[in-house]
Amino acid sequence: GKRAEKEIHLDKNGNMESVENISDGSKGDNLKLTVDLSFQQGVEDILKNAFNAELASGNATYSEGVYAVAMDPNTGAVLAMAGIRHDLETGESSVDALGTMTNVFVPGSVVKAATLTSGWENNAISGNQVLTDQPISFGGTDSITSWFTQYGSRAITAQEALEYSSNTYMVQVALKMMGTPYSADMKLDFDELDPSMKKLRSTFAEYGLGTSTGIDLPNESTGYLPDKFTFANYLTNSFGQFDNYTTLQLAQYAST
């Protein structure tokens, strides 16, 4: 579309005297939805049935709901946006398709590919680098572990870190981005904490995480990225346990 242009004439006191029409505006094209209604309904039914089953089994009592976005990775076309909102006070569930772009959640391990990307971009790791997956702790704090090496250690490549969903590989990448590779009883230097979080978030944004997706719909959330964070927050962010993103952002990330 094209905006109308008008020229406003003011008197010496700043009061409007007249308005002159310079050019008329024109209506823009209607939004061409790529959502197929039958497919959309199918996705919604899958979510509803699966979530109701989890509620019945007692596994989703405190869940805020379930959301899904289907996207064509070749074109970025959104094929379905479906959601079921669960009211924790009343226990009622309701359809909430727009929640896929307005509600934010901690994403978990799906961000690990972006963490590796940040490690490569910032020369913290190179190629299919081998690191030791091991319990990581600082000054007697609870250890950060991976499910497969909770009580031991194992040398793994970057590819295997994704395959096995290694938490501690990602933490070590984050530490190397700070210029402080992990070692037992290591001394912590927080001077590079803020710059390193900025680098990590910058890479995440390249995948669409923490930034606008560009979808032409109102009230889209760009995620929740707290301004204040701790060293522990930075480390856990490397495996998806701090910043919050929308389902739509995660779909864009997966399609990138």
Identify the residue ranges that each predicted region occupies.
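Active-site phosphate-binding and catalytic loops of NTP-dependent enzymes
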Residues: N52-T61
